[in-house]
């Protein structure tokens, strides 16, 4: 099962450098903290609508593969992050199977818990980069994060109802 927002997320084209944009827009796109927390700061109840979750092979992650270690399997999680039930963000997380060891096994068991609630409580979280992307008038971003030095890739598409717009 897929969702149109995830199709658009996969169509994002990324800027080679951070573009010159309105400061308020950049504030959202370059946020280093949890997007879940940012949405909650808008006075909203944040929830996750699960689109897809499970192991995939390399052929199902062509956009992410150049940014991750080459492995036989990856954990894929695709969601809509909703604010008071309205989708504000589409998210796609790709986790190499080698990352899923020790405490990071919890990444497979998030269920309807927003990823940010897990990631941003970890003292071992680091971010390699944020890339800004755009497709058909919508903005997105992609980050390679590390937990205890182990990589995962998070791509987010801000949907039309999001306060980013």
Swiss-Prot record:
GO terms for biological process: pyruvate biosynthetic process; ubiquinone biosynthetic process. InterPro entries: Chorismate--pyruvate_lyase, Chorismate_lyase_/UTRA_dom_sf. Keywords: Cytoplasm, Lyase, Pyruvate, Ubiquinone biosynthesis. GO terms for molecular function: chorismate lyase activity. It comes from the Bacteria. It catalyses: chorismate = 4-hydroxybenzoate + pyruvate. Pathway: Cofactor biosynthesis; ubiquinone biosynthesis. Substrate binds at residues 35, 77, 115, 156. Its EC number is 4.1.3.40. It is found in: Cytoplasm. It holds the Pfam family Chor_lyase. GO terms for cellular component: cytosol. Coiled coil: none annotated. Its main location: cytoplasm. Belongs to the UbiC family. Removes the pyruvyl group from chorismate, with concomitant aromatization of the ring, to provide 4-hydroxybenzoate (4HB) for the ubiquinone pathway. Monomer. NCBIfam families: PRK11655.1. This is Chorismate pyruvate-lyase. It comes from Escherichia coli O7:K1 (strain IAI39 / ExPEC). The lineage of its organism: Bacteria, Pseudomonadati, Pseudomonadota, Gammaproteobacteria, Enterobacterales. The gene is ubiC.
């Amino acid at each position: 099962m897929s969702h149109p927002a995830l199709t658009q997320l996969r169509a994002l084209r990324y800027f080679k450098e951070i573009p010159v944009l309105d400061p308020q827009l950049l504030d959202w796109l370059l946020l280093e903290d949890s997007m879940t927390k940012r949405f909650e700061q808008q006075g909203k109840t944040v929830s996750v609508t699960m689109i897809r979750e499970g192991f995939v092979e390399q052929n199902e992650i062509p956009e992410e593969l150049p940014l991750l270690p080459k492995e036989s399997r990856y954990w894929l999680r695709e969601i809509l992050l909703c604010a008071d039930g309205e989708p504000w963000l589409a998210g796609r997380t790709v986790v190499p199977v080698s990352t899923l060891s020790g405490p990071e096994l919890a990444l497979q068991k998030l269920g309807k818990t927003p990823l940010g609630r897990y990631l941003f409580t970890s003292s071992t979280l680091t971010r390699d980069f944020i890339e800004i992307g755009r497709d058909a008038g919508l903005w997105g971003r992609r980050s390679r994060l590390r937990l205890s030095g182990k990589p995962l890739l998070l791509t987010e598409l801000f949907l039309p109802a999001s306060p980013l717009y």
